Amino acid sequence: MLLDGDLLRHLKHLEVERRLAARTLANYQEAFKRLQVFAESAGVALREVQPHHIRRWAGQLHFKGLAPGSIAIELSAWRGFYRWLGRDGHVVLNPVAGVRAPKAPKPLPKALAVDQAVLLADQFDHADSPLLEARDHCMTELLYGCGLRVSELLSLDAQASTQAAGWIDAQDASAHVLGKGSKRRSVPVGGAALRALAAWMEVRGELATTGEAALFVSNRGTRLTPSQVRSRLKLRAIKAGLPTHVHPHMLRHSFASHLLQSSGDLRAVQELLGHASITTTQVYTKLDFGHLSKVYDAAHPRAKLKPPLE
């Protein structure tokens, strides 16, 4: 189709003065063709287009299945055209100025299948250092079995104290963590994680430097960093033969997904993840810890393993 004179002159401006690449110019030309078709179908001249026209046309593009990102590019091209017309005094109002593309849907969090998560947790590398294997096994169990954020995991201290941001109480099978916004919460710890914790605590002293409070320490004996956890978990997933890139937050997603699938209790899962309004003086808003423990024990696949014997 033959483009309107204004559109042709604007394309020339983009080519000569803005020096846009040929491929970019071709994309702009397609966007302008659609703008002209919309205007002709509405019986309105390009210089007389109003914001309600643009909103309707953007809606039609969305209805036809054009991705929000592509619609945003389309609107950007149209917006630039009307800005250019405005500089020459041909239009008073830029009809695209206040129009935004539909928001792109947030991607669903990726979670492992139950059998993949269990395989990852149960992975044992005989070639690895027994100390590192015990540590990594414990970290994996807590990330998946408790749904901890990596920051919460690494803030755990080996012993409870007034200075500790987080700790695990093996006696009442709970992890006490400081989450986002300095909000404390308690999360039940299942039998598999307690067994892994006991095994790690037996050898932790061989790595930790004197006086180091951190539950999880590096080869240097100091508190682990998030990047070190990501690296070790990635390696563990590769050795387990998992076909996907695994990171700590994926285990948190897996925790939530598997628990919700089994229990259907959205409110309990929300509390366990720390997504509710939890303050430092009130751990839970509406659900008591006993109810959360019951939901966890009945639904989470790693909670059903027996804890270590004294």
Say what each PLM segment does.
Residues 1-310:
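Conserved catalytic core of the tyrosine transesterase superfamily
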